[in-house]
């Protein structure tokens, strides 16, 4: 695993240098036109109170100022704060960061009965969707419940999306119901493919089918969690590219890598993206897709 300071092997595309608040770092961008967009990062401080059902108590944090420096050092132009399950519906830190920094957008966790006016205010602050963090739930919420039907109606009406994080084996019915509701859906972490079958199994087939709707996007994020090699991650990415094209994929670092079994750095995440999508032009189109989706 490459660490900061190690030599970076040459890759296809133009080699430019992005000057940040630290040393200038070589970054390959297609034509030096499209900076990286990190579509999945968690920003928080250790002072924030965790939710009662938090699945872990992280020994790291990632304040917004530190992350902005990290972005500059790695040629990342913009980023999307993904609502963190550990904080529940405490979205204060995310909203403050969005208000202060136009290069950031974010998602929030809300109760299904949240008022429309609250959502509209969040939208003006830079929020672009809600997150269903439904991993590790003993029982999934009922999307046909009137409260959830109203929530999905409001999300669609605002032009927002539902960010979905769920185990692969539980994905098909939830994703199908969301697509039928008319909302846009962004599926986290490659869609949690089966480690043996990849996208050939039931859950993978459901994801590929949903991509055909034109209302579903997938994040190439958190591959370090899967316990598979770069070649396998590259096959996952290639399958998704073949199914939907780069316009329906986003890249995300998942910093600060809470729950990682081995140390992971931000540079590791950036370099992993280059390895699993070795074509610099495709990486540029993936970043442009995130620019369009979250910032236009």
Predicted regions and their residues:
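Mid-to-C-terminal alpha-helical segments outside catalytic/metal-binding sites
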Residues: 2-4, 9-35, 60-78, 239, ...
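Active-site environment of divalent metal-dependent phosphoester hydrolases
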Residues: 44-46, 86-89, 113-114, 137-138, ...
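Hydrophobic faces of well-ordered beta-strands that scaffold small-molecule active sites
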Residues: 37-41, 79-82, 105-108, 128-132, ...
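Short, acidic/polar
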Residues: 61-69, 113-122, 202-203
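Catalytic pocket-lining loop regions of alpha/beta-barrel enzymes
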Residues: 144-251
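Conserved, mostly hydrophobic/aromatic
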Residues: 40, 71, 94, 130, ...
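Alpha-helical scaffold segments that flank or form the walls of functional sites
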Residues: 54-82, 87-100
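Active-site gating/metal-coordination segments in enzymes
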Residues: 88-170, 217-219, 223-225
